[in-house]
Regions:
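Predominantly flavin-linked oxidoreductase catalytic cores and closely associated redox partners
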Residues: 20, 109-222
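A short, Lys/Arg-enriched amphipathic alpha-helix followed by its capping loop at the start of a domain
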Residues: 17-29, 55, 59, 117-118
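Conserved Rossmann-like nucleotide-cofactor binding loop
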Residues: 13, 39, 148
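N-terminal FAD cofactor-binding segment of flavoenzymes
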Residues: 38-94
């Protein structure tokens, strides 16, 4: 009888976990990927760290020459910080390594088929709506379902620097290989350069700055009238799980914690 581990969720944390487990578990294990196809990714675009690319290299034999375009990704060599100090500065990735800017709407359809092709004996993919992890009959479960819906088993820090994001995308390719991180009067703004669009996110605390004020300041930076900004926005609390390991269940990615998205720590750690 094979040992089993289920990975629930196919966002960036779930896909990275699948690549890692397929690579390092031997054929005495069965790995089950479970996701609900009705749940859509936030679809903003994401700046990753080198371990994500490393997991893709070992998990699906990813290489930037052949696979950047079909995955709708771009190379990331670091982050550029603007207006945090008198002069802008670049924070390069360590030791000449590279990472990826990814389209969260595109990565599942790129990665899952390649995992199935490379690991046909080890991997099984299921479409299933999971409400109760304890009802799943597997030896171990990795919970990668993103933001929690119930915070009773989480701790929320009393102070929150930012908790809301306004999103706007220009329908033109990004032109740099850096994640943009610009200080603003309300918080900071990210920009993610992708092959098909350039996405900006204005991050602020809605307990301090009103939505209308944030939109006005965001539109001024982008030189886009407030009425023409994309309607995409979302809130995100800061939190961390009281326990990451709970018997046979392990929380990963945003299911485990979220403090501040500037360093992509939920995926990196």
């Amino acid at each position: 009888m094979k040992k089993t581990v289920a990975v629930v969720g196919v966002g960036s944390a779930g896909l990275q976990t699948l690549c890692h487990l397929c690579t390092w578990l031997d054929n005495t294990w069965k790995i089950i990927s479970i996701h609900n196809p009705e749940i859509k990714a936030v679809g903003v675009g994401e700046s990753t760290q080198p371990p994500f690319l490393g997991a893709l290299r070992t998990g699906i034999d990813f290489n930037v020459y052949d696979h950047l375009a079909p995955m709708k990704a771009t190379i990331k060599v670091g982050s550029v910080f603007k207006k945090w100090r008198k002069h802008s500065f670049i924070n390069p990735l360590f030791a000449g390594s590279i990472a990826l800017h990814i389209d969260t709407n595109a990565i599942k359809d790129f990665i899952i088929p390649r995992l199935k092709e490379r690991w046909p004996v080890k991997l099984e993919v299921k479409e299933q709506d999971v409400q109760d992890l304890n009802a799943l009959d597997y030896d171990y479960i990795v919970d990668c379902r993103g933001y929690p819906t119930d915070f009773s088993e989480y701790i929320k820090p009393p102070a929150m620097l930012i908790n809301h994001a306004l999103i706007h995308s220009f329908k033109r390719p990004g032109t740099t290989n850096y994640t943009g991180q610009t200080a603003t009067k309300d918080g900071w703004m990210f920009d993610i350069p992708l092959p098909q669009r350039h996405t900006h996110g204005y991050l602020y605390c809605d307990k301090i700055t009103s939505q209308s004020e944030a939109k006005k300041n965001f539109s001024k930076i982008l030189k886009v009238p407030p009425s023409q900004l994309d309607k995409t926005e979302f809130s995100f609390p800061a939190y961390y799980a009281k326990t990451v390991f709970d018997g046979r269940i392990f929380k990963n990615g945003n299911r485990a914690f979220l403090f501040e998205p500037i360093s992509a720590l939920s995926l990196y750690i």
